[in-house]
């Protein structure tokens, strides 16, 4: 997680603050929110996920939400498409650390599966 945070911080500093027109240059769609933490239905379920086609490809619905944020600068989903800037990155990362702790507490089975995959590989 620390490497991921450092990468985001480096990106924010490379891109810098919004330019004179105030438009955000770098948006973050990886934060913990209702899209990125959508519950996975049981394997034998016929229920389709709204935001994901599979684990690494977002659905067209998520893609349209991204485009809406990029074009309007406004997100209807909390913490989706944050503007990463040198002046705001620390607050975003602190919020994300707390959100991750909360997600882990709500999803112990998913956390155990992820940890197992990280230790033993796919």
Give short role names for the model-derived ranges.
Residues 1-122:
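Extracellular glycan-modifying ectodomains
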């Amino acid at each position: 997680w620390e490497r991921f945070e450092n990468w985001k911080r480096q990106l924010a500093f490379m891109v810098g603050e919004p330019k004179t027109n105030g438009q955000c240059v770098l948006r973050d769609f990886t934060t913990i929110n209702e899209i990125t933490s959508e519950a996975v239905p049981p394997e034998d379920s016929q229920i389709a996920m709204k935001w994901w086609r599979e684990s690494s490809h977002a659905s067209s619905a998520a893609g349209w939400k991204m485009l809406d944020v990029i074009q309007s600068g406004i997100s209807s989903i909390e913490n989706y498409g944050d503007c990463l800037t040198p002046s705001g990155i620390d607050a975003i990362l602190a919020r994300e650390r707390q959100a991750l702790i909360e997600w882990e507490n709500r999803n112990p089975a998913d956390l155990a599966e992820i940890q197992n995959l990280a230790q033993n590989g796919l």
